[in-house]
Amino acid sequence: MIAEPEQLADAFVEAWNDHDPDALADLFTADADFVNVVGLWWRDRAGIRGAHAYGFQRIFGQSRMTLRRRRVRRLGEVAVVVAQWSLTGQLSPAGEPVGERRGVLTLVGRRGQDGWRAVSAHNTDTVPGVETHVAGDGGLDPTDYREPREGGRR
């Protein structure tokens, strides 16, 4: 049982690092929403479980997630948990290891008789040097509108 909302992010990372879709899905209410880093949206615990089972089998089976920073805002029986993460060990479609990723996971938790569970989650990648994306013929292009500083850095 999750006794404090702060523990939601810790339990998510633990389930992720164990590559355990059942433990991860159990952190959510039956009707929870989860939006992943590319905008795929699962609308219940079973969908969240299935998506993560697939991810652990095909993409993230060797991955390791680390919490870098966390902020919790309690709103009575509800809390918003924002957690910055880093991830290593992801595999390419060819099965080769790829570089480190970073992102932010936002969990909205609600306290119930069985402790805290997430009712909603949104996960997003952090893309260094990018402010937004611009839609073009080939899809979305990472874009930065800021003026380069001296030396070409933004």
Locate each region found by the language model.
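A short, structured loop/turn motif at beta-sheet edges
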Residues: 72-80, 109-117
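A short hydrophobic beta-strand element
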Residues: 77-89
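Short, cysteine-centered beta-strand-loop-beta hairpins and adjacent loop/turn segments enriched
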Residues: 88-99
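A solvent-exposed, acidic/Ser-Thr-rich amphipathic alpha-helical stretch
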Residues: 2-3, 21-75, 84
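Low-complexity, intrinsically disordered terminal/linker segments enriched in charged
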Residues: 111-112, 118-154
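Short, surface-exposed coil-to-beta transition loops
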Residues: 65-67, 82-84, 99-105
